[in-house]
């Protein structure tokens, strides 16, 4: 399945909530959801209620697009989470949060997950002192993530770091801005992740 290439703003409007796909724009009055908080298209404002299946599908699509994954990747994470001990939905979100591209975004080294993915692919980051260029690389508690020294002058990284206070730093991460380095301290709890999603609907969708 190909990666979704439609307008990021249309994706957010379809889900009628901010998915923070366009970086700083999402925090401004230019955000499409702020101006038109209804699905795009001719009948966007008049759409009726979803069936149970429709709600499950919408929630699955919302989370998948939030993290920028294709269906095959997304389902693989779910299967992995389902095999783990504990609550499947929480396990699932934790796996997504452990991705290095997501952590680069959370630390404020990128303005969006899409930008973080691009930066990781171009080898701008180190994990425990070693270059990693695979966006799906999963971090473990105690792992450090730092910007390669030669990449610390990149405008997009520095602009993202300047805008970081708008988003705030999650409690499971630690950041030393002066050193361009962060630490994945511990696995996040569901409460700490504070995501506006209903992951149980995804569990129900894949459990059929």
From Swiss-Prot:
MF term (GO), any: structural constituent of ribosome
Gene Ontology BP, a term: translation
Keywords carried by this UniProt record: Ribonucleoprotein, Ribosomal protein, RNA-binding, rRNA-binding
GO CC annotations, alphabetized: small ribosomal subunit
Chain ranges of the S4 RNA-binding domain: 98-160
UniProt entry tagged with the keyword Ribosomal protein: yes
Transmembrane residue ranges: none
InterPro entries on file: Ribosomal_uS4 (IPR022801), Ribosomal_uS4_bac-type (IPR005709), Ribosomal_uS4_CS (IPR018079), Ribosomal_uS4_N (IPR001912), S4_RNA-bd (IPR002942), S4_RNA-bd_sf (IPR036986)
Gene3D superfamilies recorded: Ribosomal Protein S4 Delta 41, Chain A, domain 1, RNA-binding S4 domain
Domain of life from the UniProt record: Bacteria
PANTHER family (UniProt xref): 30S 40S RIBOSOMAL PROTEIN, SMALL RIBOSOMAL SUBUNIT PROTEIN US4M
Quaternary context: Part of the 30S ribosomal subunit. Contacts protein S5. The interaction surface between S4 and S5 is involved in control of translational fidelity.
Family: Belongs to the universal ribosomal protein uS4 family.
Function in brief: One of the primary rRNA binding proteins, it binds directly to 16S rRNA where it nucleates assembly of the body of the 30S subunit.
UniProt protein name: Small ribosomal subunit protein uS4
Gene: rpsD
């Amino acid at each position: 399945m190909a990666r979704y290439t439609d307008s990021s703003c249309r994706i957010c409007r379809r889900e009628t909530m901010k998915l923070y796909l366009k970086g700083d724009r999402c925090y401004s009055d230019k955000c499409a959801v702020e101006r038109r908080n209804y699905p795009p298209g001719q009948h966007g404002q008049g759409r009726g209620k979803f069936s149970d299946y429709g709600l499950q599908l919408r929630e699955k699509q919302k989370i998948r697009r939030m993290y920028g994954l294709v269906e095959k990747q997304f389902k693989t994470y779910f299967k992995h989470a389902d095999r783990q001990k504990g609550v499947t939905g929480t396990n699932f979100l934790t796996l997504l949060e452990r991705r290095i591209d997501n952590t680069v975004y959370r630390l404020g080294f990128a303005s969006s997950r899409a930008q973080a993915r691009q930066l990781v692919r171009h080898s701008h980051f180190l994990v425990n002192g070693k270059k990693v260029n695979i966006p799906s690389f999963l971090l473990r508690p105690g792992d450090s993530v730092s910007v390669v020294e030669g990449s610390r002058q990149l405008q997009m990284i520095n602009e993202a770091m300047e805008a970081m206070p708008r988003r705030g730093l999650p409690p499971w991460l630690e950041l030393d801005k002066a050193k361009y380095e962060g630490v994945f301290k511990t696995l996040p709890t569901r409460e700490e992740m504070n995501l506006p999603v209903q992951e149980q609907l995804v569990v129900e969708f894949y459990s059929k």
